């Protein structure tokens, strides 16, 4: 079993515990408990929750259309009707969408109720579970409302990945790839040597490595004032692509494409060598992205990038790699020149996109 990680926060310190069986940990939680459960998790592991009173469970349909303030307020109303008080604990099982809703509601209700998180997707295990950040969508725009409110403890049982679909499994790999590129060279080389699917026993190692890298960044810049912005690597274009496809592609898959776009632009800006761009691209194509993405209206994607929260005036703070494999924040003006580079990217990567 992997060693736990202790995360230092200006709000309070919290721990990531790597566990063998979530059922044992769940049974050991004491006090007054209320549960926020991904419906899919409940259906797959119903027997594990058999001893819980149904009226204490708020079921989540984990789709982007539900990641809004309407769902947050529904959960808060559920807390009120159940009689939840400050000394209760909110127990959350699910991926990033369920996490976002539980974070926001727990933070707002009674000015903070403690919550605990069992991430059940690879994406939430290897990235979103730490850092305390949540994002709530407004209309078609992603993550326009948010707070920083970390769980009191995170319990990672990697056996949950055994029941993930191939698409959901792929979702987490963009974040692992991101951290491998910015860690020591050995991490990236290890990842390159792996097959597309890694068993539970081995994947825990990569989850731990990725979280350890993220821990360094969020402890130095918890509230995203500067350094933490580098964690948006791949997300700027990824979020725009999600919105463009009306969430037909999943977040993690969009981020992997976003990493490829960011690397292409970094090469064109002279920040990295072409060899690094092509090497990462080859890994992405072999292990991650095997389907074609159709972009008929690149100008629409570019316009969606303009709505990114990192835009100031007409300048975007773009997270990119440099030659030392460090993530940096590189300002780029959202003008005709950048749009032309984006279109050039689409034209030169026709095996990924059809523009």
What is the role of each PLM region?
Residues 193-299:
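Active-site segments that bind and position negatively charged phosphate/pyrophosphate groups
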Residues 74-93, 102-117:
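Non-catalytic interfacial helical region
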Residues 19, 35, 119, 157, ...:
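Residue-level signal for inorganic ion chemistry
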Residues 97-104, 240:
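Short glycine/serine/threonine-rich phosphate/pyrophosphate-binding segments
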Residues 8, 83-85, 108-109, 137-138, ...:
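Solvent-exposed alpha-helices and their adjacent loops that cap or buttress functional pockets
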Residues 5, 176, 272-355:
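C-terminal charged capping/lid subdomain of soluble metabolic enzymes
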Residues 104-194:
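A glycine/threonine-rich phosphate-anchoring loop and its flanking beta-alpha core
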Residues 1-89:
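ATP/NTP phosphate-donor binding region
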